UniProtKB/Swiss-Prot annotation:
UniProt KW keywords: Cell membrane, Competence, Membrane, Transmembrane, Transmembrane helix, Transport
Entry annotated with the keyword Transport: yes
Transmembrane stretches, start-end: 21-41
Residue ranges annotated as Extracellular topological domain: 42-449
Protein name, entry field: Transport protein ComB
Entry GO terms, CC: plasma membrane
Amino acid sequence: MKPEFLESAEFYNRRYHNFSSSVIVPMALLLVFLLGFATVAEKEMSLSTRATVEPSRILANIQSTSNNRILVNHLEENKLVKKGDLLVQYQEGAEGVQAESYASQLDMLKDQKKQLEYLQKSLQEGENHFPEEDKFGYQATFRDYISQAGSLRASTSQQNETIASQNAAASQTQAEIGNLISQTEAKIRDYQTAKSAIETGTSLAGQNLAYSLYQSYKSQGEENPQTKVQAVAQVEAQISQLESSLATYRVQYAGSGTQQAYASGLSSQLESLKSQHLAKVGQELSLLAQKILEAESGKKVQGNLLDKGKITASEDGVLHLNPETSDSSMVAEGTLLAQLYPSLEREGKAKLTAYLSSKDVARIKVGDSVRYTTTHDAGNQLFLDSTITSIDATATKTEKGNFFKIEAETNLTSEQAEKLRYGVEGRLQMITGKKSYLRYYLDQFLNKE
């Protein structure tokens, strides 16, 4: 090799194969890469809590139907039952007496309904349709209605008679005053005619009311001006007096002719009375119909208990027992024995239920994604993906604090439904958002949520 090449190679090695080029530069490049990755890449933020598998709906509440001792009990947790399967059989007791009581009550209610329908028809047609006196007092109610209607008619008739009498008296008074007005007007005309005769010197008919005054004037000398003035003044005084009386008569005439209107609301009052009674009857019929349905239902239930003395499954499903009564041989009537859940295989969905503290619940909302993982069998875990469907508005108080109930409904495959059981516990992971790795580690360092 030529010596100049050796010198060049040595120079290259010294310049580029040093500590800076071998360590610092690669580390700097790595740091830049990691910083860029931490800035761009995102990490899912999540919460985790325990959750249980619950039914999406409850098919039926199985309640004790007797206070008697349980002889046969086929209730088992998570047991798959078919419609009609025997669940509980009781020792026969007082069901027979109760069945008779329901039957007697039902007969009485039906008779009461029949009598009430008689009352309804009687009210509608205004005639008594009761074949005989009833023990519920409905016929007496109809008689009371007839009496009230009669009182209304009598009151209205009496009122109209009084009004007619008053109107007749008013008409008669007005007619009499009208006659006085006519007579007074005739007198005024006579005196006005007499005045004109005195003033003009013409003759006056003898039948004129002022003829005597006219004659007196004529006898005193009609040529005397003073006599003429006195005669005219006397006539005018009579006219003024008559006009004053006429004005009074006219005022009396105007006030005396008022006619009162006859009472015309009888039909509406009678219709209102009938409507009130019919409305009350309608309400009682509705109430009786409800009572009859209840009595028929009770009679049917007691009859079934009397005949069979057992509880059977109302439909296909899975049993969930009430832990408070699962080991009891005597359970009070009406107490919950178990609940019937839909089969997971047939329903194809389930509900995941969990509880979160008030601190964590603020970080989630309806629609957030969740993942459920079973924990009872580490070698055969199930993973279910869903979204939050509901969050309780109020917290549930416990010894450990206040917790909010959250639910997430999830669909199941046939394989998942076969392996899953109601009540199975697992971990529920809720994705609350995303952060870059840089922001995540900064928040961790600064102890931020």
